[in-house]
């Protein structure tokens, strides 16, 4: 099934839009120029097959979970939000945007920027595969091991590249959330220091998101959201 999807994606290789100026600026700050943004394309739609699976209730201890309403464990059917293949990201139609930094520098959707950052890390993993050992099929194999590939725990001595590919993307997604809402928190600093082991992320005192972010849920308790290291 994976090989079939891979072939379909290759047939669509000529499709996709380039990154916007604001997206490039954000990525340059986030990744320190370690992504060749000219090669990146975002495609509206993914040929991935819908699957039925048990969606677990994730622990509400991270910024990326706390900005959303609680989710109950249940059986769901759906397609993945995106499929990253080399320098292309195929985005599910309901999540595709013409600009994930829309509104910058006045205000941006935090959820959109987090989603964009997550997927761009997969592009970074591919473009820097001599460092990461990445291949799309390796990343896909993480989804068939019975555990949630996106969950991670930060240990004192853990290196960024010690994590799985989806975990690395989730760590950067969490970092964007914490940097936006709780920049001075211990967790934000720990995430920053760990990510900086692998690429030159912008200093925490630099504003890479603009003047404000829009939250996806009215009941978010922002104060201390990343206070736990």
Residue ranges and their predicted role:
Residues 1-9:
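Sec-dependent signal peptide recognition
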Residues 22-51:
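Post-signal peptide N-terminal segment of mature Sec-exported envelope proteins
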Residues 22-28, 35, 84-86, 93, ...:
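Metalloprotease/metallohydrolase-associated module, dominated by Zn2+-dependent proteases
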Residues 47-92, 96:
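Catalytic zinc-binding patch centered on the HExxH motif and its immediate surroundings
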Residues 74-82, 93-117, 159-161:
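Short pre-active-site segment immediately N-terminal to the catalytic Zn-binding motif
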Residues 112-126, 180:
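Conserved beta-strand->loop/alpha-helix structural units within folded catalytic cores of enzymes
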Residues 120-138:
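Catalytic Zn2+-binding segment of zinc metalloproteases
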């Amino acid at each position: 099934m994976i090989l079939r999807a891979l072939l379909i994606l290759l047939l669509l290789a000529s499709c996709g839009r380039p990154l916007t100026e604001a997206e490039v600026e954000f990525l340059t700050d986030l990744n320190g120029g370690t992504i060749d943004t000219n090669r990146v394309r975002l495609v509206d739609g993914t040929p991935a097959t819908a699957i039925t699976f048990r969606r677990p209730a994730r622990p509400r201890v991270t910024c990326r979970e706390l900005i959303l309403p609680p989710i109950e464990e249940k059986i769901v059917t759906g397609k993945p939000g995106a499929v990253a293949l080399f320098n292309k990201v195929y985005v599910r139609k309901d999540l595709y945007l013409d600009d994930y930094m829309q509104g910058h520098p006045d205000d941006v959707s935090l959820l959109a920027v987090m989603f964009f950052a997550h997927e761009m890390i997969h592009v970074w993993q591919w473009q820097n595969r001599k460092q990461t050992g990445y291949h799309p099929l390796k990343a896909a194999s993480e989804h068939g091991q019975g555990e949630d590939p996106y969950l991670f725990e930060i240990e004192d001595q853990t290196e960024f590249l010690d994590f799985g590919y989806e975990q690395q993307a989730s760590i950067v997604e969490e970092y964007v959330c914490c940097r936006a809402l709780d920049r001075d928190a211990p967790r934000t600093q720990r995430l920053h220091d760990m990510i900086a082991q692998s690429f030159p992320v912008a200093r925490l005192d630099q504003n890479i998101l603009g003047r404000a972010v829009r939250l996806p849920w009215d009941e978010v308790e922002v104060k201390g959201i990343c206070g736990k290291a």
